[in-house]
């Protein structure tokens, strides 16, 4: 019986250590700086690898906005949202709520 008590105590200690480790991880505010560095590295990689494939302006637009490919024959179109649309989508508000507030 004492073995099971020690085993349960060891498992609880491991769970507490895991929670402490998760608390020390990067907060969401810090993650955006990591993403900026990742985007810079990705842009540099595109510039170095695709020397003959992309022009410098084309590579910058590839990293800035997500692209929509409506069909394979047409050019890709960037998605752009206004700030109010972004805020409403984050708050899960319908579009008519925004019009009612004006």
Swiss-Prot record:
One cellular component term from this protein's GO annotations in UniProt: neuronal cell body
Compartments it resides in: Secreted
Listed GO MF terms: neuropeptide hormone activity; signaling receptor binding
Keywords from the named record: Amidation, Biological rhythms, Cleavage on pair of basic residues, Secreted, Signal
UniProt modified residues of type Alanine amide: 100
Leader sequence segment: 1-24
Pfam family of the protein (one): Pigment_DH
Segments traversing the membrane: none
Keyword Signal carried by entry: yes
Highest taxon of source: Eukaryota
Name listed for the protein in its UniProt record: Protein PDF
Organism per entry: Drosophila melanogaster
